[in-house]
């Protein structure tokens, strides 16, 4: 009888956990003033990000991290108690609201970049007449920093970062800096040293992704740096290892983030509501390994996630909406997002449930029951 009760309890736990993992849902996991850019540490289960917030006292630290298995118990001045702030760089932001970009490798790279180390843009305004823009390097928990890992010659902080995890650009960190009507694309080795890949007139990008080198799945996008431009053009573009740019036509929407769908859990930084939101979107299971884009603007039919793909028949890049945030009761006006594998303790709970069931069956066999 005891074994039967154990089995029933384990079965109920397994069913409840599976239902949670497979259901569509949205939940606020943290409160952060003015979150702008986020990234995700795959081995630590942390969302790491930057903010733009008008309260100048908040800039004693520039970045923050959230353990996604935690939930806020208290919120003070827009900041929940499960947020770890770090950085403490000589930064002071005024004017503009573009925020500081952050990124991290999802795995150890052959070039020497290590998983979960943090690379973040910031502006040193200690000399207000001569601001300087840098990429800072942080160890995974943010307690150690190399503030001047790389210093840009131009102080513009309209910069996007992305790691080449495919090898097209030597498994290096890529930076795309926009200055007066011109974009400069660079690759950085582990010391921060930069090599220019190309410069492009009248181009400004909102997102970067080095597409896996699988021509069957990605067609002419395979192995290329895929980006979306902003402003009047809003085009899909690719750049190859030699810096040659190809324009694939108009998107007509603002794609803030490009990603490969590796799971069905999304972390969304929603700037207007000062929140980090966890979305569970089972529809993404149908697009594992595909390119997806996070669309944020006020144009109909609304913000959401698009599937971006190479159409072999027309030899062109196409996209279709596969999820609308309104279906989750959300209406983000300015945000970025990351999509990740199942990160929470629910996955461990599911595995534990399965192991408990197997242990029960083994004990039953041993006892002849």
Predicted regions and their residues:
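Bacterial N-terminal signal peptides that target proteins for export
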Residues: 1-8
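Basic polycationic patches enriched in arginine
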Residues: 5, 362-363
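Bacterial N-terminal signal peptides
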Residues: 10-18
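Intrinsically disordered, low-complexity serine/threonine-rich segments
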Residues: 17, 26-28, 347-348
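Bacterial Sec-dependent signal peptides at the C-terminal "C-region" and cleavage site
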Residues: 19-24, 360
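Sequence/structural signature of beta-propeller domains
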Residues: 24-339
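A short, hydrophobic C-terminal helix/tail in secreted or cell-surface proteins
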Residues: 342-360
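Short, charged juxtamembrane terminal tails flanking transmembrane helices
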Residues: 364-369
């Amino acid at each position: 009888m005891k074994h039967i009760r154990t089995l029933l309890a384990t079965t109920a736990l397994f069913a409840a956990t599976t239902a949670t993992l497979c259901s569509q849902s949205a939940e606020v996991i943290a409160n952060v003033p003015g979150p702008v850019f986020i990234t995700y540490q795959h081995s630590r289960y942390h969302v790491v990000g930057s903010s733009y917030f008008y309260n100048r006292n908040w800039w004693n630290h520039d970045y923050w991290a959230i353990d996604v298995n935690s939930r806020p118990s208290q919120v003070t001045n827009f900041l929940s108690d499960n947020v770890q702030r770090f950085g403490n760089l000589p930064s002071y932001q005024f004017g503009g609201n573009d925020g500081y970009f952050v990124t991290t490798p999802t795995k150890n790279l052959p070039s020497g970049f290590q998983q979960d180390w943090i690379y973040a843009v910031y502006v040193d305004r200690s000399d207000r007449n001569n601001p300087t823009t840098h990429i800072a390097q942080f160890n995974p928990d943010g307690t150690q920093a190399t503030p001047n890992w790389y210093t840009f010659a131009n102080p513009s902080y309209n910069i996007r970062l992305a790691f080449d995890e495919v090898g097209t650009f030597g498994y290096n960190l890529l930076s795309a800096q926009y200055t007066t009507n011109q974009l400069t694309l660079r690759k950085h080795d582990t010391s921060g040293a930069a090599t220019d890949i190309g410069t492009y007139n009248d181009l400004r990008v909102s997102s970067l992704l080095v597409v896996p080198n699988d021509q069957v799945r990605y067609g002419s996008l395979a192995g290329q740096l895929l980006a979306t431009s902003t402003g009047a053009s809003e085009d899909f573009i690719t750049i190859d290892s030699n810096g040659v740019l190809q324009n694939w036509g108009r998107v007509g929407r603002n794609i803030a983030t490009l990603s490969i769908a590796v799971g069905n859990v999304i972390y969304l930084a929603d700037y207007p509501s000062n929140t980090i939101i966890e979305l569970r979107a089972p529809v993404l299971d149908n697009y594992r390994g595909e390119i997806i884009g996070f669309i944020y603007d006020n144009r109909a039919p609304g913000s959401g996630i698009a599937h971006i793909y190479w159409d072999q028949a027309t030899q062109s890049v196409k996209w279709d909406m596969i999820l609308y945030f309104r279906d989750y009761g959300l209406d983000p006006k300015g945000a970025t997002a990351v999509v990740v594998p199942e990160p929470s303790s629910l996955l461990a709970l599911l595995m534990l449930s399965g192991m408990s069931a197997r242990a029960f069956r083994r004990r039953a066999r041993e006892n002849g029951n």
